[in-house]
C-alpha cells in the first residue's frame, strides 16, 4: 500500500507520529494478510508494551483474529476479522476506486 509508505515517510521526515498504532496494525494486516506478531510489531513504531496493549485491545474488540502457529504453537498469527477486512476494502473502493482495494 503506497499510502502507508507515504505516511511512514512523513512521520520520519517530520519526527512526529501521524497515525495511531491501531491504524498501522490494521493496514499492515490488510496489505499483508495473516502475520506473526513480531512482523506486525515491526510494521509499527510501538514499544513492546504499547504493542501488546494495543493488539490485545484490538483482539478483544473483535477487530483482529489470532491463531497459534502450525509449526510452533508459541507463535501467534494475527489477521483482520473478516468483517473488518471487508469494511476496509469497501471504504478504499468507495474513496479511491477499485484499484485501491
Where are these regions (language model features)?
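Canonical helix-turn-helix DNA-binding module
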Residues: 34-76
Amino acid at each position: 500500500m503506497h499510502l502507508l509508505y507515504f505516511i511512514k515517510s512523513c512521520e520520519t521526515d517530520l519526527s512526529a507520529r501521524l497515525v495511531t498504532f491501531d491504524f498501522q496494525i490494521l493496514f499492515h494486516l490488510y496489505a499483508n494478510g495473516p502475520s506473526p506478531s513480531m512482523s506486525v510489531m515491526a510494521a509499527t513504531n510501538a514499544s513492546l508494551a504499547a504493542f501488546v496493549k494495543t493488539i490485545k485491545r484490538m483482539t478483544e474488540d473483535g477487530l483482529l483474529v489470532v491463531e497459534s502457529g502450525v509449526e510452533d504453537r508459541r507463535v501467534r498469527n494475527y489477521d483482520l476479522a473478516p468483517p473488518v477486512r471487508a469494511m476496509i476494502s469497501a471504504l478504499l473502493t468507495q474513496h479511491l476506486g477499485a484499484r485501491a482495494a
